[in-house]
Amino acid sequence: MSTAARRRLMRDFKRLQSDPPAGISGAPLENNILMWQAVIFGPDDSIWEGATFKLSLQFSEEYPNDAPTVKFLSKMFHPNVYADGSICLDILQNQWSPIYDIAAILTSIQSLLCDPNPNSPANSESARLFRENKREYNRKVKEIVEQSWSS
């Protein structure tokens, strides 16, 4: 069955394979183009450097008109990531546009690591530490980075 969503996902996949953004990879599961796994590496020269985070992306037949559901599979401590791994990011919600492809989604999530929005917290403890106690926030992020190596 060849739908517009599946054709678009194949195009996104080919583009991701031929011109991958730095620190990002992703691919559909073997038997389901609507389910993807991705890896985001922590940006260099940041407290996230060296991290390897796994994510899942679930697309509907309405993609690219509807945003995918994206979750961290790796443990995460970040102001904009819920306990279940869901991500509070405007382009995955009210600012979604069909112009975003998978590379843009993953790049935006990678950027969010270093540039959180503590005013729209999904994790209130992380947001509070980010605003009020950067040293403790950085310590907890370092723990998550180290845990990401074995997850």
Swiss-Prot record:
List the catalytic residues: C88 (glycyl thioester intermediate)
Principal EC category: transferase
What sequence ranges are listed for the domain UBC core?
A: 4-150
**Coiled coil start-end:** none
Q: Which SUPFAM superfamilies match?
A: UBC-like
Q: Name one Pfam family in it.
A: UQ_con
According to UniProt, the reaction catalysed is: S-ubiquitinyl-[E1 ubiquitin-activating enzyme]-L-cysteine + [E2 ubiquitin-conjugating enzyme]-L-cysteine = [E1 ubiquitin-activating enzyme]-L-cysteine + S-ubiquitinyl-[E2 ubiquitin-conjugating enzyme]-L-cysteine
Question: Which keywords does this chain's UniProt record carry?
Answer: ATP-binding, Nucleotide-binding, Transferase, Ubl conjugation pathway
Q: Which PANTHER family match?
A: UBIQUITIN-CONJUGATING ENZYME E2
In UniProt terms, what function does this protein have? Answer: Catalyzes the covalent attachment of ubiquitin to other proteins.
Q: What is the name attached to this protein's record?
A: Ubiquitin-conjugating enzyme E2 2
Report the source organism.
Dictyostelium discoideum
